[in-house]
C-alpha cells in the first residue's frame, strides 16, 4: 500500500489554496481522496500513466472547491470509474422527517440540497456516484470509516 500526498510545490501559484489530493495505491487499484485543483488532477493523470492505471476511484469528502475543483479535469480525461461521496438527495425524506417544521417540503429540501451541494450535484450525469454511507469498501483494503449516516 502506497499513500502519496500531493503538494502545491512547483505549481503555477503555490500560495493559492490548491486544496487536498491524496493518492492511495493498493498495487492493483488507485483511489484518489479529493482533488482540489486542476494541477493536482494533471499530476494524478501522470501518476496513472506511470503506474499503468486506466481508471481510478475517487472519494470526495465534501463539496468545497478546495476538495472538488480538479474533478472536472479527471472526468474530461475519462479516468474516473466511480466517485464516492455524500448523496444527500437520496435521503431527502429522512432529512424532512428530522427537520420537519411544517414550512419545508420534500421539493424544497431537494432544491436546497442541490443548491448547497452544487458541485456534487453537477457530477450526477457525468460519472457513477456511490453513497459514502453505504458503499464504504472502495477497493481491496481501502475502506471509508466515516462519516456514518447519523453524522
Question: What name fits each language-model region?
Answer:
Residues 1-51:
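Conserved beta-strand hairpin/beta-sheet module of binuclear metal-dependent hydrolase folds
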Residues 1-6, 68, 73-151:
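Flexible, acidic/histidine-containing loops and adjacent segments that form or flank the divalent-metal
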Residues 7-9, 15, 28, 54, ...:
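Generic serine detector
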Residues 17-18, 26, 63, 100, ...:
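Detector for Asparagine
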Residues 29, 38-90:
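Active-site metal-binding motif and surrounding structural segment of the metallo-beta-lactamase
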Residues 35, 62, 146:
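Conserved residues at beta->alpha junctions
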Amino acid at each position: 500500500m502506497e499513500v502519496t500526498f500531493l503538494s502545491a510545490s512547483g505549481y503555477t501559484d503555490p500560495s493559492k489554496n490548491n486544496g487536498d489530493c491524496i493518492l492511495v495505491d493498493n498495487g492493483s487499484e488507485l483511489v484518489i481522496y479529493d482533488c482540489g485543483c486542476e494541477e493536482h488532477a494533471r499530476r494524478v493523470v501522470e501518476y496513472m500513466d506511470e503506474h499503468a492505471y486506466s481508471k481510478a476511484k475517487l472519494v470526495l469528502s465534501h463539496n468545497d472547491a478546495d476538495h472538488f475543483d480538479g474533478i472536472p479535469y479527471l472526468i474530461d480525461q475519462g479516468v474516473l470509474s466511480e466517485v464516492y461521496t455524500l448523496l444527500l438527495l437520496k435521503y431527502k425524506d429522512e432529512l424532512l422527517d428530522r427537520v420537519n417544521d411544517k414550512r419545508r417540503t420534500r421539493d424544497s429540501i431537494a432544491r436546497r440540497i442541490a443548491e448547497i451541494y452544487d458541485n456534487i450535484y453537477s457530477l450526477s450525469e457525468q460519472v457513477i456516484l456511490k453513497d459514502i454511507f453505504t458503499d464504504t469498501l472502495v477497493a481491496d483494503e481501502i475502506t471509508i470509516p466515516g462519516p456514518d449516516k447519523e453524522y
